[in-house]
Amino acid sequence: MRWLLPLSRTVTLAVVRLRRGICGLGMFYAVRRGRRTGVFLSWSECKAQVDRFPAARFKKFATEDEAWAFVRSSSSPDGSKGQESAHEQKSQAKTSKRPREPLGEGEELPEPGPKHTRQDTEPAAVVSKDTFSYMGESVIVYTDGCCSSNGRKRARAGIGVYWGPGHPLNVGIRLPGRQTNQRAEIHAACKAIMQAKAQNISKLVLYTDSMFTINGITNWVQGWKKNGWRTSTGKDVINKEDFMELDELTQGMDIQWMHIPGHSGFVGNEEADRLAREGAKQSED
């Protein structure tokens, strides 16, 4: 009869774990992509696997079977309920924000869908707040600009803004005006902020691989304005009009400017770059 004891304990444990989810005494946290994948019984355990992990995928379930099905599948299990949180963020970013705990019964965020080409540039209708990814209370967005033959007569520049997989606000368009890489980076950020304001979003975490844009808007612009839009050496600011527009757009916004290495495998940055390159192929209006 001794051999029955381990089996009895195993069965009892399985029943207890199942009851934890059903009775609301606990939930099952499934991590599909993180430092460790699997099913965890507490948010703190789950958070340790996904916090600051690029493109982490995790979701909360009421039953262990559903949780494991999510871990093993490439898309959400049919009929499953929960809320997945997708954080495509730079792992070495210095910020006090942390991924939020999934809120329980709700729809899973979509997996990456077909790649989008140019989006309608008309003002977008207000979209559900649930379609965005968050870092704390701030909405996450990735921007990028590109320019082929930069500095030459045949230069073609585009801007890309990426809000998430299959998001209706994802956009890739041709840069109007002077075709340069730096202008494209600045105006990609401008486009993202304009879109955010149209959605009544006031808090952003904006990822860009352009330190020029970040330094310009967070450090240099105040000195330029004091000097009559001249550099510390007395020269005219080359991208004066572009930074003036960006500076005006940031008023009333709470923006965390985050640098992310370009072409380093971070999904959000790669998608923003793809959109920018598609935009550069378009004709100028």
Curated annotation (Swiss-Prot):
Its cofactor is Mg(2+). SUPFAM superfamilies: L9 N-domain-like (SSF55658), Ribonuclease H-like (SSF53098). In the presence of magnesium, manganese is inhibitory. Mg(2+) 2 binds at residues 144, 273. One of its GO terms (biological process) is mitochondrial DNA replication. Binds 1 Mg(2+) ion per subunit. May bind a second metal ion at a regulatory site, or after substrate binding. It catalyses: Endonucleolytic cleavage to 5'-phosphomonoester. InterPro entries: Ribosomal_bL9/RNase_H1_N (IPR009027), RNase_H (IPR050092), RNase_H1_euk (IPR017067), RNase_H1_N (IPR011320), RNase_H1_N_sf (IPR037056), RNaseH-like_sf (IPR012337), RNaseH_domain (IPR002156), RNaseH_sf (IPR036397). One of its GO terms (cellular component) is mitochondrion. Residues 135-281 form the RNase H type-1 domain. GO terms for molecular function: identical protein binding; magnesium ion binding; nucleic acid binding; RNA-DNA hybrid ribonuclease activity. Mg(2+) 1 binds at residues 144, 185, 209. Its EC number is 3.1.26.4. Keywords: Cytoplasm, Endonuclease, Hydrolase, Magnesium, Metal-binding, Nuclease. Pfam families: Cauli_VI, RNase_H. Belongs to the RNase H family. Monomer. Endonuclease that specifically degrades the RNA of RNA-DNA hybrids. Plays a role in RNA polymerase II (RNAp II) transcription termination by degrading R-loop RNA-DNA hybrid formation at G-rich pause sites located downstream of the poly(A) site and behind the elongating RNAp II. This is Ribonuclease H1.
